[in-house]
Amino acid sequence: MAAFTPITIAYGDGIGPEIMEAVLYILRKAEARISLETIEVGEKLYKKHYTSGISEESWDVIQRTGIILKAPITTPQSGGYKSLNVTIRKTLQLFANIRPVVSFYPFTRTLHPNLNLTIIRENEEDLYSGVEYRQTHNMYESMKLISHTGCKKIIRYAFEYAIKNNRKKVTCLTKDNIMKFSDGIFHRVFNEIAKEYPQINNEHYIIDIGTAKLATKPEIFDIIVTSNLYGDIISDVAAEISGSVGLAGSANIGQHYAMFEAVHGSAPDIAGKGIANPSGLLNAAIMMLVHIGQGDIASLIENAWKKTIEDGVHTFDIYNEHSSSKKVCTKEFAVEVIKRLGQLPITLPKAAYPLIVKKQESNIDYKIDTREVKKLVGTDIFINMHVFSAHDIADKINKLDIGNFELKTISSKGLKLWPHDSRFEIISDHWCCRFMNKDGTEIKHLDITMLLQSLSKANIDFIKVENLFEFDGVAWYSLAQGE
């Protein structure tokens, strides 16, 4: 008798419980070789003052099983609560988010019948690191964190995925014309790794034009690899133009753990009505079965699901009176899929997953390269001051004893306002004062400490210090507009 794989089940919020019940019903009837352990996460935990939406007991279950099938959850939009999705992905180091998007034309409505692409999204970094601050009465900050090792992991994963799944092209999307360091390193690593895969075509688009092309000509894409925020946005764009966000599932893959979920949210507006489409979570479950080596059950369910779609048995979100034959509720849809277990689709591609899946290389040991010579050459000190002119700030600072430093520039929101007059008056309470060593020698941390003491004695409210570094003689800090 084949061993049963333990799976953690999270019912989620909103429509989550009803679509999870439908999916588990199908899995039981298909005789999936899994054993279930249920955890409570999301809204109920937030209401119990778990700011992360998950308890220690649930973490113990996840650590024991290693695999999660999760329905959508609702994250409160205020009050300091953290996104549970982001927390799980980061805690379990699920660095790769895999979102296949396929058109099921002519059985679902879409303008893009040949749509068939996969979005591979970096899952741990970027603005989704969730590092944010309020610095002044007027200014808020969210940090975009991108690492060299993180870029290498996700980009190599994308090319390996292309090889494994017989894909022909990988497209990289960034905004490195503006964010030259963070998005720039993503693009540079993409170019470097692409050279190792000459059999795979590669290309790059700026995210705005890339998204426009995705919305109008998705057929030109095969695999898209991108960073966290961009990937989140374009995944929903792609799912929507496929015919319904409710059809798409996704996988979150790491070295030791994996989580499978629908792309769509918890849809509280239709919760409890029994009309939600369970297909997204079902497709996520199919991806899970493939991942754990139960390709036979995955194929059985996917073929039955496709036959159900072909037969025009649709939930309300994709129902079309001209092409659908029957409108069904969530539970009825599950029953219709179960009726077709063992049947094959006629028009849509038949699924035939292998029983034993070769695990994609996701445990490469990426070490931090420390060979570049790092030199501290200056510091940006951000201050909170209610003035209308950067000249007032410069006059005050230049009267202080600041040692071997000199004040080079003052800027606000990246616009240089001193030493030269600005064309326009800037209303701000958030100023960046750039200090460099007068003789160009390396700066010590003690020098910066003494500088901060001088500012403090003058009642200048410094709110952040960002040191400026050269690596192998190259300046790795941005210049203000106009500098």
Curated annotation (Swiss-Prot):
InterPro entries xrefs: IsoCit/isopropylmalate_DH_CS (IPR019818), Isocitrate_DH_bac-typ (IPR014273), Isocitrate_DH_TT1725_C (IPR040978), Isocitrate_DH_TT1725_C_sf (IPR046997), IsoPropMal-DH-like_dom (IPR024084)
Enzyme Commission (EC) number: 1.1.1.42
Catalysis: reaction(s): D-threo-isocitrate + NADP(+) = 2-oxoglutarate + CO2 + NADPH
Record site: Critical for catalysis: 128, 175
PROSITE patterns tied to this protein: IDH_IMDH
Domain of life according to the entry: Bacteria
Keywords, alphabetical: Glyoxylate bypass, Magnesium, Manganese, Metal-binding, NADP, Oxidoreductase, Tricarboxylic acid cycle
GO biological process: glyoxylate cycle; isocitrate metabolic process; tricarboxylic acid cycle
Cofactor(s) essential for the protein: Mg(2+); Mn(2+)
TM annotation in the entry: none
GO MF annotation, one: NAD binding
Residue ranges the record marks as coiled coil: none
Pfam families: Iso_dh (PF00180), Isocitrate_DH_C_bact (PF18324)
Binding site for D-threo-isocitrate: 83, 85, 89, 99, 121
Binding site for NADP(+): 74, 264-270, 277
Subunit structure and binding partners: Homodimer.
Family statement drawn from the similarity comment of this UniProt entry: Belongs to the isocitrate and isopropylmalate dehydrogenases family.
Function noted in UniProt: Catalyzes the oxidative decarboxylation of isocitrate to 2-oxoglutarate and carbon dioxide with the concomitant reduction of NADP(+).
Name under which the protein is recorded: Isocitrate dehydrogenase [NADP]
Organism in which the protein naturally occurs: Rickettsia prowazekii (strain Madrid E)
